[in-house]
Each structure stands twice: as C-alpha cells, then as structure tokens.
C-alpha cells in the first residue's frame, strides 16, 4: 500500500512558518538603514526592526512587511544621549513611511523641526528641556495636521498662540494630551468632533469651561484638573453621554453641581475636589450604577450627606472631607466606614463639631470612628452656640446672687435702724 500523501491544506500549514520567516527576512530599505546608522542606534542584529526586545537599547523600532524592502513605521527614543541629534538629512529618508515618533526623557535633544507631516502619532515626555532654543514650538506642532494621537507631558510648549491655533488643522485627532506644559489662555471655542480623549491638566488655563467641550458627543475622558478655571460647571455637560472619566479638580469652579450630570450614566470616575463648589451634595450620585471613584473633598458643601452605606461601600474610592458645613447622619451610616474629615450631624442637621474641635478630637483618629468611648466623647462635645448659652446662663446666676446678697444686707441694715429708733422712743 502506498503511503497517504499530505492534503494540500495540511501542506500549507506546514509551510506557513517558513513563509512567515521569508517575509520577515526582507531587508530594511538601504537609505533608511543608513539614516539609522548615522544616529548611532545600536541594534543586536543587522536587522534594526528586531530590536524591540533589547532592553539595553535606547530606541525601539517598528517596521512594515513590505517587499523587496521593509520600511520603518515607528521610532521610540528613551533616555537619549546628550549627543543625539536629528538633522533634516537623517529624517528625510524616513518621512515617507514614518507614522509614529515618541521621545521619553530626552531633555537635551532639540525638537525634530523637519518631521514629516504624515505622522499619525507624536509623543514627548520630559523632553526638549535644556533651553529656549530646544523647547517644543506650538507652531511646529500645528504643522502635524494628520495626527490622530498627540501626547505631550512634562514638556514645555513655547508659544504665544492660543491652543486652538495648535489644534486647528488636526481634523483627525482622537486623543489629545498636553499636560504640565505651561499652557496658558482660554479653552478653545471649538474642537474637532473626532476627539475621544482630552487631558489638559496641570497647566495655567483660565476662564470658564466652554460649551465647545459639551459638543464632543463621542468624548470618553476629560481631564482639566490643576488649572485656574472659574465659573460654573455647564448644564450642557449632560450631552457627553459616553463620558467615563471626568476630572475638574484643583480649579476655582463655583456654584452647585448641576443636576444634568446625572444624565451621564456611563460615568465611572468623577473628581471635583479642591474647588469652591457649594450647595448640598446631590443625591442622584447614589443612582449612578457605574460610578466607582467619587471625590468631592475640599469644597464648601453644606447639609447632610445623602448617601447610604451600600452606595459608599460599592465605590472603590470615596473622599468627601474638609467641607466644614457638611455632616453625616450616624444613624444611617455605619461606624465601620472611614470618612476622613467629616463630622456627624446634630439633631438639627448641622455639624456636631466646630473646626477647632474637629482638629483636637480627630488627632490620630478617623472622623467616622464614633463607637464606644469615642461616641461618649462625641456626645460630650458642644458647639460654640451651646457654650455661649452656658456662659450666658452662668452670668445670669451670678447676677441674681449679687442682687440677693445686696438685698439681704440692705434688709439687715434696715432692721438694725428700726430697732435703734424704737429704743430711742
């Protein structure tokens, strides 16, 4: 009997690894290889496209699978040498294929001003820091009109132009991060509708939260924290129905939390801490089933905290402290919860502790730990009004005693006088 011949599909499967090896063995474009060699980029083999797993390398390179030559599509520089430079003659051979370029911890490097405008992704973290000549230019960024991702962090942007001028031509941009980059001015009056992620935190932006942001129907994350934004949270924020993360912390926002915020049912992370927000804490938060992170600390909220124990326990993070006029109902919330910087309410719904008493009574303890001996201390604490009433009462008592003693002395003297007159008669 003749041995059975392998079926064609099985034969193809057996040959597939060989075919893949053949494809990946195509050499790098000679001009691009020469450009890399001029940058002194060390590679473990003759193929720079295979250095991604080399931890000792200061660069990471990605290539396509084109034939007869492969092309570089992505370069990431990390911990750059002070001697590294990117002259235009080096970048020019890369311009036709390079779509992603990133720099991390390259402080002495000058920005690559001759970058190809075909880039889809540009990232700079703690780079271009040495002097004004090497700082990143807003005008340079504005040229990159094909970007889909722009990530700038801890890298100053030198520009007298407004943020909109930088972003104006980036119609394809979906992810925008410019954080800790010395941005000033106002939030742009308009954004391109493709944006899904915005992080403009740790800058010096001022003015109000513009309505332009609420028109970004596909926005999933918005971080405007650590700026100098003022005014109120706009009611139209309810339009951001796909928003999952919202951070407006460390600004100068005032007014109340708008009820329209309850319309963002997908919200999982909300940080409004360190502002000047006032009014009562909305009860609708407890109905937002996806909410896992809630920070309302360091504001001017007042009244009774409207949350129950099950809602707070369902959160991964909850901070509400340092709202001096806000308190919790200890008959609703268990003492097992740890609420830092929040006083219990008295029977009238006001904080039981004054701020000075809070500091004394909370030294080394949690604000919510009021069981046992702590509960007895809590009951013995008096508000300023109670102390004033006691002080007034003691003054009245002393005054009454004084009048009584004076009357007694007068009566004795009067009787003595009458007795003396009777003897004379």
Curated annotation (Swiss-Prot):
Signal peptide (residue range): 1-25
Glycosylated sites: 40, 54, 79, 132, 182, 202, 223, 245, 278, 308, 329, 395
Region named Disordered: 355-389
Topological domains annotated Cytoplasmic: 419-425
Topological region Extracellular: 26-397
Skewed-composition ranges (Basic and acidic residues): 374-389
Keywords noted in UniProt: Cell membrane, Glycoprotein, Leucine-rich repeat, Membrane, Plant defense, Receptor, Repeat, Signal, Transmembrane, Transmembrane helix
Main location, first listed in the record: membrane
Pfam families (UniProt xref): LRR_1, LRR_8
Localization annotation: Cell membrane
Membrane disposition: Single-pass type I membrane protein
Transmembrane regions: 398-418
LRR repeat start-end pairs: 144-169, 170-193, 195-216, 217-240, 242-264, 265-287, 288-313
Coiled-coil intervals: none
Superkingdom of the organism of origin: Eukaryota
Similarity annotation: Belongs to the RLP family.
Functional note: Involved in plant defense.
Name under which the protein is recorded: Receptor-like protein 55
């Amino acid at each position: 009997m003749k041995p059975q011949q392998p079926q064609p599909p099985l034969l193809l499967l057996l040959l597939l690894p060989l075919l893949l090896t053949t494809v990946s063995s195509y050499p790098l474009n000679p001009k691009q290889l020469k450009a890399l060699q001029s940058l002194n980029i060390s590679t473990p083999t003759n193929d720079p496209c295979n250095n991604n797993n080399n931890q000792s390398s200061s660069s990471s390179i990605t290539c396509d699978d084109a034939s007869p030559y492969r092309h570089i599509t992505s370069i990431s520089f990390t911990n750059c040498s002070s001697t590294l430079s990117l002259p235009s003659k080096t970048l020019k051979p890369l311009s036709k294929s390079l779509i992603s370029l990133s720099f991390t911890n390259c402080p002495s490097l000058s920005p690559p001003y001759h970058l190809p405008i075909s880039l889809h992704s540009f990232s700079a973290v703690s780079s271009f820091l040495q002097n004004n000549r090497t700082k990143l230019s807003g005008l340079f960024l504005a040229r990159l009109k094909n970007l889909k991702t722009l990530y700038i962090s801890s890298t100053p942007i030198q520009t007298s132009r407004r943020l909109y001028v930088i972003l104006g031509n980036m119609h394809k941009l979906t992810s925008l991060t410019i954080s800790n980059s010395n941005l000033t001015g106002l939030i742009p009056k308009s954004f391109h509708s493709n944006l899904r992620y915005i992080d403009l935190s740790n800058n010096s932006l001022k003015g109000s939260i513009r309505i332009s942001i609420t028109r970004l129907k596909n926005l999933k994350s918005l971080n405007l924290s650590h700026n100098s934004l003022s005014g109120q949270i706009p009611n139209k924020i309810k339009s951001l129905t796909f928003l999952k993360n919202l951070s407006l912390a460390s600004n100068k926002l005032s007014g109340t939390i708008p009820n329209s915020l309850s319309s963002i049912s997908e919200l999982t992370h909300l940080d409004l801490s360190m502002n000047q927000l006032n009014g009562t804490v909305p009860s609708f938060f407890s109905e937002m089933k996806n909410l896992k992170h809630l920070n309302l600390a360091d504001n001017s909220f007042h009244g009774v905290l409207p949350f129950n124990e099950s809602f707070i326990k369902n959160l991964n993070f909850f901070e509400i402290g340092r709202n001096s006029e806000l308190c919790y109902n200890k008959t609703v919330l268990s003492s097992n919860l740890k609420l830092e910087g929040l006083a219990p309410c008295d029977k009238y719904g006001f904080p039981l502790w004054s701020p000075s008493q809070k500091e004394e009574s909370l030294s080394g303890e949690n604000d919510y730990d009021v069981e046992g001996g702590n509960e007895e201390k809590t009951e013995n604490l008096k508000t300023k009004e109670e102390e004033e009433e006691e002080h007034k009462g003691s003054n009245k008592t002393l005054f009454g005693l004084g009048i009584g003693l004076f009357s007694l002395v007068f009566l004795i003297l009067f009787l003595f006088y009458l007795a003396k007159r009777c003897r004379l008669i």
